Amino acid sequence: MDVLVINGPNLNLLGTRQPRFYGHKTLADINNDLLKIAKENNINIDFYQSNHEGQIIDKIQQTAAKIIIINPAAFTHTSVAIRDAFLAINKPFIEIHLSNIYNREEFRTKSFLSDIAYGCIFGFGPNGYTLALIEAINYINMKGE
């Protein structure tokens, strides 16, 4: 596998959950858009969503992906354990958020992942996933993997 896309808690509710912040696209819509781009670029992509921190950590530890795209959702601001999982596997990842976390409540402005991420994309709605995948493809091509 080339790219793993991980989505954290409550992202299974996209399309109906707070559309002011997150838009009207569902997670399935976003995944379908990414799958098309991946196929056009001969990239193998897999998708995973969980509301449970431990399951996300297990997925991070077990993946054979060359690069990970993650929207950790609320775990962004709370999970040292997810941070430690990324440090343990020593693989690049791109942190993504639909909304601009720096333009939200104060408690949402701290990310436990940003400083160790390959890159971060915030505030572009569902298009942020596309931007992240384009950069993941660039990374894979740059590494010649």
UniProtKB/Swiss-Prot annotation:
Pathway: Metabolic intermediate biosynthesis; chorismate biosynthesis; chorismate from D-erythrose 4-phosphate and phosphoenolpyruvate: step 3/7. The active site is at residues 22, 97. The keyword Ribosomal protein does not apply. It is an enzyme of class 4 (lyase). Belongs to the type-II 3-dehydroquinase family. NCBIfam families: aroQ, PRK05395.1-1, PRK05395.1-2, PRK05395.1-3, PRK05395.1-4. This is 3-dehydroquinate dehydratase. It comes from Francisella tularensis subsp. mediasiatica (strain FSC147).
